[in-house]
């Protein structure tokens, strides 16, 4: 039996026009994350790291405990979903990073979050 933690991450992003102010170089994006435990042992998300890059190449790093104030436990076959946001000075950018996790055997491991786009639908980069 393979007890290696297996966690999948999916992200969908959207531009929030009602909270944005392009004339002030303020572009607000929401992103919805689904974290699925496809392994055979329970896991807990204990920390996060994000690298946010705007359309001019300016990078911002964000790290901290948990996500949206929680450190969720995810049972085998289970999932955890949350929504958060980012504010950029450009109408396009990217995010990527990782989650720091711990499994039921108290082993720490990292789950990579592949790069995803933050963009107004009318902008192509």
UniProtKB/Swiss-Prot annotation:
A biological process (GO) annotation for this entry?
error-free translesion synthesis
| Stored Gene3D superfamilies | ApaG domain
Q: Which InterPro entries match?
A: ApaG_domain, ApaG_sf, Uncharacterised_ApaG
> Which parts of the sequence belong to the ApaG domain?
1-125
Q: Which HAMAP family match?
A: ApaG
The protein's name in its UniProt record: Protein ApaG
* Source species: Erwinia tasmaniensis (strain DSM 17950 / CFBP 7177 / CIP 109463 / NCPPB 4357 / Et1/99)
- State the encoding gene: apaG
């Amino acid at each position: 039996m393979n007890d290696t933690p297996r966690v999948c991450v999916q992200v969908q992003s959207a531009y929030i026009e009602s909270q944005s102010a392009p004339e002030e170089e303020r572009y607000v994006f929401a992103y919805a994350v689904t974290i699925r435990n496809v392994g055979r042992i329970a896991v807990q998300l204990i920390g996060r790291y994000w690298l946010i890059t705007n359309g001019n190449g300016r990078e911002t790093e964000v790290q901290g405990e948990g996500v949206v104030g929680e450190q969720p436990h995810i049972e085998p076959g289970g999932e955890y979903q949350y929504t958060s946001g980012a504010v950029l000075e450009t109408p396009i950018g990217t995010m990527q990073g990782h989650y720091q996790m711990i499994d039921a055997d108290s082993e720490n491991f990292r789950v990579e979050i592949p790069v995803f786009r933050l963009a107004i639908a009318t902008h192509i980069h």
